[in-house]
Regions:
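N-terminal beta-alpha lobe that positions the nucleotide/phosphoryl donor
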Residues: 1-111
Length: 111
């Protein structure tokens, strides 16, 4: 599946690595960040950055940021919401592409 933009729902080194690869592939990268990370390298590296009013664990805010930015897909990185089957389902139900294992696989991994 091909897309032109992704929102990276993570921070730090993993966000930088995801963005580096995606930008090499010609994909626009959108970062989300909290105030404490406003000057972090991953925010500066992104083509666009959206400040979250809460935390990296606020799935609804992340989906809202994806819609606001026009992102076509969400890459969760690791940790945070990457192992949350309900979040993966919510991403898909909002007509966004989930870059990661299916919600079913995430649930099975947790059992």
């Amino acid at each position: 599946m091909r897309f032109n933009s992704i929102l990276v729902a993570n921070r730090g080194e993993i966000a930088c690595r995801i963005m580096q690869t995606a930008q090499f592939m010609g994909i626009k990268c959108i970062a989300v960040f909290v105030n404490a990370d406003k000057d972090a390298p991953f925010v500066k590296m992104a083509d666009e950055a959206i400040k979250l009013s809460s935390s990296y664990m606020d799935g609804s805010a992340i989906i809202d940021a994806a819609k606001q930015s026009g992102a076509e897909a969400i890459h969760p990185g690791y940790g945070f919401l990457s192992e949350n089957a309900a979040f993966a389902r919510k991403v898909k139900s909002n007509k966004l592409i989930w870059i990661g294992p299916s919600p079913h696989v995430i649930k099975v991994m947790g059992d």
